[in-house]
Curated annotation (Swiss-Prot):
Homodimer. Zn(2+) 1 binds at H61, H63, H141, D209. Zinc phosphodiesterase, which displays some tRNA 3'-processing endonuclease activity. Probably involved in tRNA maturation, by removing a 3'-trailer from precursor tRNA. This is Ribonuclease Z. PANTHER family: ZINC PHOSPHODIESTERASE ELAC PROTEIN 1. It comes from the Bacteria. It holds the Pfam family Lactamase_B. It catalyses: Endonucleolytic cleavage of RNA, removing extra 3' nucleotides from tRNA precursor, generating 3' termini of tRNAs. A 3'-hydroxy group is left at the tRNA terminus and a 5'-phosphoryl group is left at the trailer molecule. GO terms for molecular function: 3'-tRNA processing endoribonuclease activity; zinc ion binding. Belongs to the RNase Z family. It comes from Clostridioides difficile (strain 630). Its EC number is 3.1.26.11. Zn(2+) 2 binds at D65, H66, D209, H268.
């Protein structure tokens, strides 16, 4: 299972009841943070996410409402006693941005590994996240902006009959199921000797900030959860959305429908949007399985058996 928490669902400026953009994913104790707006640490503390052992931080773009919480978080991580490497992924400019932050943070006893502007699919050189495939897409915003898709792959189902038939020692079963090749007593053992049919993973996609460009539906296709910006609830605000390169509730829902996703989570609401629920029908009339984001909303995604 995968646990996801929307730490902040606001856009532009923080509000008393709405912190800025941030999403936290916990998969088997491995932790991923997507964006880090103001208030992120407060929500993390309230939800007991933990700071020390974040494995990966992904930044969509370098507007303040998505990164102004990162400086403080890097400092807090340092003060937690962390010494292992921390990987940060982001668009063009992320290296210079992190370098500037690093100059302001007094104590960083860990190495920052930065991946700038990755294209297409990639996996991390990280044993604990080896089953995670990440994809990026260039979005249409006022500055360089990345959308992310996280595909949590599953190892194929273990086939005990196959393992027995191939006379594989039981002490090797777990490692082979994890995908390792093993030599024991001069004999080679490979994963295909114990593995059966493939199992479906879980796909989580996120796009913010952007207009609803044609490439998004294919990028988010068949996602179990699609997290999408929805800056404006009222259809009458479409001119603002076009001008500021954001989306309305209805536009986000249309992307979810075109992408054949299972569930849509709306986030990144304008400060002028006092009661987002007033406009929820603008989304549900297009895509029924729509959830309205709120700070510290938690969701659990389960793997199919």
């Amino acid at each position: 299972m995968i646990d996801l928490t929307l730490l902040g669902c606001g856009g532009n400026v923080p509000m008393p009841n709405r912190f800025l953009s941030s999403v936290f994913i916990n998969y088997k104790g491995r932790k991923i943070l997507i964006d880090c707006g103001e208030g992120t640490q407060v929500s993390m503390k309230l939800k007991k996410c933990g700071f020390k052992d974040i494995d990966l931080i992904c930044i969509t773009h370098l507007h303040g409402d998505h990164i102004f919480g990162l400086l403080g978080l890097l400092s807090t991580i340092g003060n937690s006693g962390r010494t292992s490497d921390l990987t940060i992924v982001g668009p063009v400019g992320i290296v210079d941005c992190i370098r500037s932050m690093r100059n302001l943070v007094e104590y960083v006893p860990y190495t920052l590994k930065i991946i700038e502007n990755p294209q297409g699919n990639f996996s991390l050189d990280n044993k604990v996240l080896r089953n995670l495939e990440i994809s990026t897409i260039s979005l249409e915003h006022s500055i360089e902006c990345l959308g992310y898709s996280f595909n949590f792959r599953r190892n194929p189902k273990f086939d005990i009959d196959k393992a027995t038939k191939n006379e594989v020692p039981k002490i090797l079963w777990n490692k082979l199921q994890e995908g390792q090749n093993i030599v024991l007593d001069s004999k080679q053992y490979t994963p295909d000797m114990v593995l059966g049919e493939l199992r479906k993973g879980v796909k989580i996609s996120l796009t913010t900030d952007t207009r609803p460009i044609e490439s998004i539906p294919d990028f988010i296709k068949d996602s179990d959860l699609f997290i999408c910006e929805a800056m404006y609830g009222d259809d009458l605000d479409i001119s603002k959305a076009v001008r500021n390169k954001h989306m309305t509730f209805r536009e986000a829902a249309n992307l979810a429908k075109l992408g054949n996703v299972k569930q849509l989570l709306l986030t990144h609401f304008s400060p002028s949007l006092d009661i987002p629920s007033m406009y929820l029908e603008n989304a549900t009339n297009v895509f029924e399985n729509t959830i309205l984001g709120e700070d510290r909303l938690s969701l659990r995604l389960n793997f199919d058996e």
